[in-house]
Amino acid sequence: MKQIIQLCLLKIYALVERTGLLSTSMGRSLFFAAYGWYKLFIEVGNIRSLRSYVKPGEIVIDIGANVGFFTKQFARWVNGSGFVIAVEPEESNYRQLLKNLNNSGTAGVVRTVQGVVAEQHGTLKLAINPVHPGDHKIAAEGIDVTAFTIDELVQQEKAFRVCLMKIDVQGAEERVLLGAQETLQRDHPAILIEIDDDALRQMGSSAERVVTLLMDFGYVIRKFGKNSQMDQISLAEALGMCRNGRYVDLLFV
C-alpha cells in the first residue's frame, strides 16, 4: 500500500512539475507541506519511538537528509551540548534543508554537510532524478559531489557519542556502513535504515549483505513502522520483508 501511494504521489508531482508551479514560492510551500504529511503519516511510522535512543550531549547523524523532515525531529530531541549532523548532496534539497531548519528554529543545533557519505573520502557522481526529489543516487555518471565517511565526519567529535543514525541513500547503504566501522565499534549507535534490495543490487550490494554486516557488529534487528512495537526479528524474517521489490525500514540496536 505504501508503495502504491508513493507512486501516485510521484505521478502527481511529475504532472505539477511540468506546469511550472513548483518554481513558485507558493508551489514549493504546498509541495513541502504535502511531503511532510506523507513522511509523517504514511512512510516513516512511529518516529517518536527513536527518541529514547537520544541522550543529552550526544550526536545524531541524518544521512540522506533531503529537506530535513527527520533532521528537524532529531534537532528537537538533542540537548545540552548534543547536536545533529545532516548530510544531503543535491543542491535544491540542500537549500530547502537550510531554509526549513531556519524556519523551524533548529538550525543552531544542526551541522549541515553538502555531499554524500561513502566508504572513503573523494569525489563521486550523483545521478539526478528529475521527477523524484528523493531519488538522487550515487552512479557512474552525474554531477560531481564530495564524498565523506562517517568516521571522518565525527573525527573531531570523539568526546561525543554518536547515539543514532538514520540512513536513506538509495542503495548505497553498505558503502555508508563501510565508512563507519570505527564509529559502529566505538559507539554502537542505534541505526534506522531504509532497505531496498533492488536498489542495493544495482550498486553491487544486497539486503543480506547490509543486514549481515550490522549483525557482525553485534546488532539485533527490530521492525520499524507505524504502530510497530519494534519487535526483534531474525535475519530470515528481515530478508523476507525485503522481497518482491518492497523496501522496508529496519531498526538496528
Residue ranges and their predicted role:
Residues M1-V253:
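Phosphate/nucleotide-binding beta-alpha loop and adjacent structural elements of enzyme active sites
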